[in-house]
């Protein structure tokens, strides 16, 4: 169980999701916030989104400020430390703090930095294969992430694929991307097919179900129709998962051991 000793009513947590135009795509973050708030008791927890929907980061910090919060712990709920984590979120926080006197902040690591995410990925893969009988031939494993032009993001995904490969005693777990980076998802699947496997397993590196997971499943369905002799398996997104509450609390506790400051633009 995570230790909660240092949290109080004047220290709030701002949980920053990406945001979706589809209301159903934003509900998992709200549910996660309710779980974190229940765990922490008197500590205010506020959801917000970087883009596409509300509340915005500015609205989220302002809400915490009105609730008497003097110190805000900002938790980026992103799986990789791309531009959103390193620039966009701090920039928006800085703009907001310029209007909020006497509020200080600290930033946690992004969600994907928590080691439990690897365990969650392992759980989703095990669930996807639970009802599948063993196959006599070879299996190709594909890890597909959002994608970014940022080489650091690409490196994170490649490292995760290596960890998954090692933990699962899998010969090869091939990383690929939906956009803005190579290898692309489509090219990776074509390569997997060319190796004439008995089964192809696709693991989406996505936090929650939504438009991108539907896109992945659609691509797999088309190829399954084209190559019916191959067994195709697609795992679910990482969440919802009760362990995400522990991840957020762990990251927040680690971050608050740093100094709070005013992050101004």
Task: Describe the residue ranges of each PLM region.
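Active-site-proximal alpha-helix that buttresses catalytic centers in soluble enzyme cores
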Residues: 1-265
